Amino acid sequence: MLDRLKMRSSALVMLVLAGLGLPRCDRPAPLDMAAYDALYADPVPVLPDPKRIYFIGHSLIGRDMPAMVAQLSGARGAGYESQLGWGASLKSHWEPDVPVNGFEVENAHPRYRDAREAVASGDYDAVVMTEMVEIRDAIKYMETHDYLHRFAAATWAANPEARVYFYETWHPLSDPEGWLERIDLDLGRYWEGEIMRRALAHDGMTRPIYLIPAGQVMARLVREIEASPGLPGLTDRTDLFSDDIHLNDQGLYLVALTHFAVIHQSSPEGLPHALLRADGTPADAPDPTAAALMQRIVWEVVQSMPRTGVPPA
């Protein structure tokens, strides 16, 4: 009887924690570094073209960035769909009883497809996910590692050949810890240490989840342009942003290049820099010299990081 009461009490505690959005205590320990490194020891074979992509996230994906990826991909792409929200967590995209803030507004376009339905369909060669900002709150309250694991497992169950990607974003420019400082620290301590390594520690997770290191690319570009000002239209970090957190068209172009390079395992150097937004209007194009710098930096960064799956230079 006592054991039964303990089991009931534990179950009740877990329900209360979930209802309050508080962290659970049963999260797996991060996959040890030797096993984690082994998953990425060999570059992944290139997926055959054309590739169909599905995006899950929020306004740091938005409508325009996937449209830019599709234009950069050209005949290598086979279309894309998405489910978005305002600051939406992966948990809200998975759980039917957890609301996705801004759902009606963000998904009022022809590229919308329900997230659970999409990954279960087996229709996609690449599934790209990101987590809400602030990443520390997502880890603490939204069980990010678990929902990354759930979406990845569902994707592979429907299409064993599909690739799963985790898109590293950033935090507000005004972050008191320092914008560049946090990008340097957060990749290891949060994106990989608390999310990817815990997701891959779940039972049955024997395949890598690949990283789209947009934050690292942005930090590298910002360091270069702020150390050597004078590039037309790109002199400091604010030239990539429309506000404290969201990107302007130049910033979106940089992130789209990063997605292209990782998913296609191909250099973005020489790609077009004058693209359209999702609504068909011309995006504000970077200066050709700035675009060439972006393309070079993207390729150097993704080649230098084994978690991207891209072969090293």
Language model regions located:
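Bacterial Sec-dependent signal peptides at the C-terminal "C-region" and cleavage site
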Residues: 16-32
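Conserved SGNH/GDSL esterase-like catalytic core that processes O-acyl groups on lipids
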Residues: 63-145
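Serine-esterase "nucleophile elbow" of acetyl-processing enzymes
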Residues: 29-88
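Acidic/histidine-rich, surface-exposed loop or edge segments in extracytoplasmic proteins
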Residues: 47-55, 125-136, 280
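Conserved catalytic region of serine esterases and O-acyltransferases that act on ester linkages
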Residues: 26-27, 236-313
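Bacterial N-terminal signal peptides that target proteins for export
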Residues: 2-11
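Structured segments of extracytoplasmic/periplasmic soluble domains
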Residues: 59, 63, 68-76, 130, ...
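Alpha-helical cap/lid subdomain in secreted, periplasmic
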Residues: 113-249, 261
